[in-house]
Amino acid sequence: MIFNPVISNHKLSHYIHVFCTFTTFCILGTETRQAITALSTYTPAFVTAPTVLWSNCSSCMLMGIMQSLNAYTWMKDHQVLFLGVTTGYCGALSSFSSMLLEMFEHSTNLTNGNIANHTKLPNRAYGIMEFLSVLLVHLMVSMGSLIFGRQLGKEVIVAYGSSSFSKPYTPPSDTVKENAGDVDTQEMEKNILEFKFKTPAPFFKKFFDIVDKLAYALAFPLIILFVVLCAYYENYSRGKWTLPCLFGIFAGFLRYWLAEMFNKTNKKFPLGTFLANVFATLLIGIFTMVQRGKKHFSTDVPIVNSLNSCHIVSALISGFCGTLSTISTFINEGYKLSFINMLIYYTVSIAISYCLLVITLGSYAWTRGLTNPIC
């Protein structure tokens, strides 16, 4: 069953709606991830910073809530909004490539803090424990957040926010598809067969309408705003707050296109999301090598040794790579697969991505060495 929105009889109007809404949520998701990372970076922190753990947790919880709302047909009149929040916002808020980079840096003792303080593991075998620590904490927190979000949406929001039962609902058959990995059509069909269609209370309908219209209207103003800010301010904000959001737009659409093109090829292995995550991890390894790799073995000067270039590389790492890869869709897809297929999907994705980091960033770190970036 293909689940698509009914926005307008004119396809151009619909595509503009999708483009604007998706763009807005990609910008907001990238900016939120940057803000949460900055907020969670302090000393002494229980969760060692910098990390995308908080962002991944938040995005998976929101993804779970949206899955429940959509499964009970709450989003039947707002499918473009659903696409924007799940694939756009949650996808940009979470980051698979950043998680893999954390995993690599901790397991190889190459974090910025360890290099600056000359911190060493008791022996190299402890790298295995560091690898498992990052992997298990991220995956378990993300999966737990998704399950909690789904139950919160089902048992609280849908249960207490529905005004009445609605008539049986037949989804339209054009545009936004399940292939993006964020539409659970099986659960939706099950609820339809069991006559579990619910109508959200007027407050929620109005809220969805307002958010949908705001997302539609804010796309181009936000693009113009960030372009102007990026051009005017040449300080650290260019690499941390402005450029990442602009790069995130292109990354978000690339991820969505890959999912639309390739996820339908194999229902047991979401190939589109896999390609997006692996490609983003390869790029983040290369960009990190350029930003932190020593120019010469005998000096601590990095390859990128100008402040402006360093900010641009930082924006590519957090904006393009961070948004191109996603944990929320990755976890949600695994949740919908059988347990064995989920293990295969997760293992192959993580193993290949980690090996790419070893080949790119690791080989340079162990021959020339890494240093801290200048920005």
Swiss-Prot record:
Catalytic function, reaction form: fluoride(in) = fluoride(out)
Record-linked InterPro entries: FluC
Record keywords, A-Z: Cell membrane, Glycoprotein, Membrane, Transmembrane, Transmembrane helix
An example Gene Ontology biological process: fluoride transmembrane transport
Effect of gene knockout: Highly sensible to fluoride, but not to other halide salts. The growth of a double deletion of both FEX1 and FEX2 is inhibited at almost a 1000-fold lower fluoride concentration than in the wild-type. Has increased intracellular fluoride concentrations.
Keyword Glycoprotein part of the UniProt annotation: yes
Cytoplasmic-side positions: 1-11, 56-79, 149-213, 263-268, 332-338
Cellular compartments annotated: Cell membrane
Stretches that traverse the bilayer: 12-32, 35-55, 80-100, 128-148, 214-234, 242-262, 269-289, 311-331, 339-359
GO MF entry, a single one: fluoride transmembrane transporter activity
Keyword Cell membrane: yes
Gene Ontology, cellular component aspect: cell periphery; plasma membrane
Glycosylation site positions: 109, 117, 235
Residues in the Extracellular compartment per record: 33-34, 101-127, 235-241, 290-310, 360-375
Membrane topology reported for the UniProt record: Multi-pass membrane protein
Additional detail: Present with 220 molecules/cell in the plasma membrane.
Stated family: Belongs to the fluoride channel Fluc/FEX (TC 1.A.43) family.
Main function: Fluoride channel required for the rapid expulsion of cytoplasmic fluoride.
Protein name per UniProt: Fluoride export protein 1
Protein encoded by which gene: FEX1
